[in-house]
Design a protein with these regions (language model features):
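N-terminal amphipathic/basic leader segments beginning at the initiator methionine
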Residues: 1-21
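Mg2+-dependent prenyl diphosphate-binding active-site environment of isoprenoid biosynthetic enzymes
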Residues: 21-225, 231-267, 273-285
Length: 289
């Protein structure tokens, strides 16, 4: 077990923020808009997972570009979700949404740009892995192929894009339908985090299905927690694609803790548990009562 202190978790978040800050020099209004979107008060959970999985594997491989890719995908999805034609949100990450400040045209271009940059970062991380010592340099091509397949599936019409569609146009407000939205819209991007951290961190490719199970349990717990905390607001807005509103708060709480325990158990089985993952799990339980 790799022990990472809470301060190290904070240091990693600071490093991610520094990399994000320098990713788009403010040469024009588009880059300014992208910087505005990515430099909010986000918790950086998805890129953190990439870094933590790779570090726990102990191979000392650089996965920082893959970590940025996940934050780019995530931010791109938030920009699109916030648009008037979607969820019509006015606030995101404690400040006005991107389209409120820069207009819808620049918001759309920012979302497109972040998605393409995310794929470029994945390619760059593959090139970085080629420079590593053996056996990792020989794994780089397959790692990049796996990462690109995972990212395109999880962010595209088989993943988060379809999830947003089903969220906007729900067929039924039943537990099965809501679980499908969670699987497509939330779990997919977490799958990207765990898988990219694993393959670019030098993990055993034969364990990928179990790594995806990690994402499934973590992503479900993560979304259930959000739904529990958002129950009152979602009820007022008549947003019924909320699992806690459908099954009730207590059942949702029980499901949350079940998923979290499955996640922690599988972390240990894959030998990638760490003090930082434990800290993240503790943070997820905060404010739940």
């Amino acid at each position: 077990m790799v022990l990472l202190t809470k301060s190290k978790l904070a240091q990693k978040r600071e490093k991610i923020n520094a990399d994000l800050f320098s990713a788009f020099p403010k040469e024009n209004r588009l880059f300014e808009a992208i910087s505005y979107a990515i430099m909010g008060s986000g918790k950086r959970v998805r890129p953190l997972i990439v870094l933590l999985i790779a570090e726990a594997l102990g191979n000392k491989l650089d996965v920082s570009k893959a970590a940025l890719a996940l934050e780019f995908f995530h931010t791109a999805s938030l920009i699109a979700d916030d648009l008037p034609c979607m969820d019509n949100e006015e606030l995101r990450r404690d400040k006005p949404t991107l389209h409120k400040v820069y207009g819808e045209s620049i918001a759309l271009l920012s979302s497109y740009g972040l998605i393409s940059e995310a794929f470029r970062k994945i390619h760059e991380n593959g090139e970085e892995m080629k420079k590593a010592k053996e056996p990792f340099s020989s794994m780089a091509l397959e790692a990049t192929s796996i990462a690109l397949e995972c990212a395109s599936r999880c962010a595209g019409v088989q993943g988060a894009t379809l999830g947003q569609y089903l969220d906007l146009f729900p067929i039924k407000q039943e537990i099965e339908s809501i679980e499908k939205v969670i699987a497509l819209k939330t779990i997919t991007l977490f799958e990207g985090s765990f898988v990219l951290g694993w393959v670019f961190g030098g993990g055993d490719f034969t364990q990928l299905e179990r790594v995806k199970e990690l994402a499934k349990h973590f992503g479900m717990a993560f979304q259930i927690r959000d739904d529990i905390l958002d129950m009152e607001e979602d009820f007022k807005k008549k947003e019924h694609a909320n699992i806690a509103l459908v099954i009730g708060k207590q059942k949702a709480m029980n499901r949350f803790f079940q998923e979290l325990e499955k996640f922690k158990k599988l972390l240990k089985e894959l030998d990638v548990d760490s003090a930082s993952f434990e800290e993240i799990c503790k943070k997820l339980t905060n404010n739940l009562k």
